[in-house]
Amino acid sequence: MLSEPELSQLTIRSAKKHVNMYKNLRISNIFCTFAAAKVKLIYIMLFESQIHDLKMWLPWCRIRREQSALRAIVEQQRRMMKPEDVASQSAQVISQIEKMTVFREAKTVMLYYPVHNEVDLRPLLEKYAGEKTFLLPVTHRRSMEVRPYDGEDMMRKGHLGVPEPQTPTYHGAIDLILVPGVVFDNHRHRIGRGGGYYDRFLSKHKATKQVGVCYSFQLRKHDIPHMFSDRRMDRVVTPLSTIE
């Protein structure tokens, strides 16, 4: 049996041992906390920009997905139009365009070659042949340029299957651009064919009046899916109305 001094000495040694264990544990916890903070800081530094990009990318994907769905529905409606309806409603759109001061005063007008029952503006090419220079788009892999229209004999199908002029590229000023589209809304937002050719081209000609052209069923009263960066038309023309 231990004497009282021996028992006292043992108690002191045990107490010191527990104190040292507590100190080591505390130091270990501090080190772990510091290490975790350091890892978190490195993570933020490395991935914060990617997280921001992801937050921006997700809404973009959702909007583009909604645009694609709406585009498919309206394109199907347009493809089902009867030829006589295309002709009569296109004539009404042309009548609306001819009323516009910007068209009457324009010397150089860019329009498009219609496909899949788009509004057909080709009668303008013949009617104003001696008064205005008409330009048609020519598409490349990722870009679009314009060339003067010089009759059907000078037209050849491009890589998208759309007839294009074989005349020299035009680099001068354009007074008016008549823009095709699949869907528009009353705030003049536009959903195009999906290739982005017009978006890129129009962004380089912001000073030029840009007028969207469509049938009445292609015009939505409420906002269609769009990004803040998407360019709005200056005006949208339908067979029965003009939206400004």
Predicted stretch roles:
Residues 2-16, 45:
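N-terminal, intrinsically disordered charge-dense segments
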